Regions:
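Hydrophobic alpha-helical membrane segments
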Residues: 1-221
């Protein structure tokens, strides 16, 4: 998808990131709203990819296609993701991860010093985050293309992730390699890596659900 219209996908990715960053800068509620809207934007990416596959040209306005789908279900999914992320942060704090509010932290060097010997906590956080993101990876597309409740979409996404664990791990590793390579040396490669990631969100969904036998397709709860 990205190779067929790289400039549009780069523009869609930039628009998504700019909106997200702008929301995060809003005091109190901005971060919450930004998190709630993430599944909506990823639904937009999936819809755009399917549209492109059908022979239609993607457009910048496609960034908001997700808002034309069952918005409440997508926002509920965002709330689930936010709750999971907060639970992970709470767990890491309980395990002893230094926090931004720690009075001993004034510089990056202070944080590195306090983190010494606790690097394993970061590994735990990375693994838990990857598990949550992976388990819910298909949910935005499921809500965009099927008449499902949020809970049912989450169940189908989890089932698909577990059933295709090897492929999910390989995809995650490949994505990590692409992002690490893109971030070096000055992050210029992310201009390509991020659009490739958002464009690929539909590919996995299509491989698992649209090529499945009819009896295996998701049905409404």
């Amino acid at each position: 998808h990205f190779r067929r219209a790289p400039l549009v996908w780069a523009g869609l990715s930039a628009g998504w990131m700019m909106i997200t960053l702008a929301l995060v800068m809003v005091p109190l509620v901005g971060g919450v709203v930004a998190n709630l809207l993430q599944p909506v934007f990823f639904a937009s990416f999936a819809i755009t990819a399917r549209k492109q596959l059908a022979g239609e040209a993607p457009e910048m306005g496609d960034l908001f296609l997700g808002f034309k789908r069952p918005l409440r279900a997508l926002l509920n999914l965002g709330a689930i993701l936010l709750a999971a992320e907060l639970a992970i942060i709470l767990l890491l704090t309980m395990l002893g991860l230094p926090g931004a509010g720690d009075e001993e932290i004034a510089t990056v060097a202070d944080y590195v010093r306090l983190l010494k010997g606790k690097e394993w906590i970061l590994v735990v956080g990375f693994v838990l985050t990857a598990v949550v993101k992976g388990a819910l990876w298909f949910a935005p597309a499921l809500l965009a293309f099927h008449d499902l409740s949020t809970a049912h979409a989450v169940r189908w996404s989890l089932f698909a992730a577990v059933s295709n664990l090897g492929a999910m791990v390989a995809y995650g590793v490949a994505l990590t390699v692409v992002f690490v390579a893109g971030a070096l040396p000055w992050g210029l490669g992310l201009i390509v890596a991020i659009p490739m990631m958002v464009a690929s969100t539909y590919t996995g969904y299509a491989a698992v659900f649209e090529e499945a036998a009819p009896a295996e397709e998701p049905t409404p709860a």
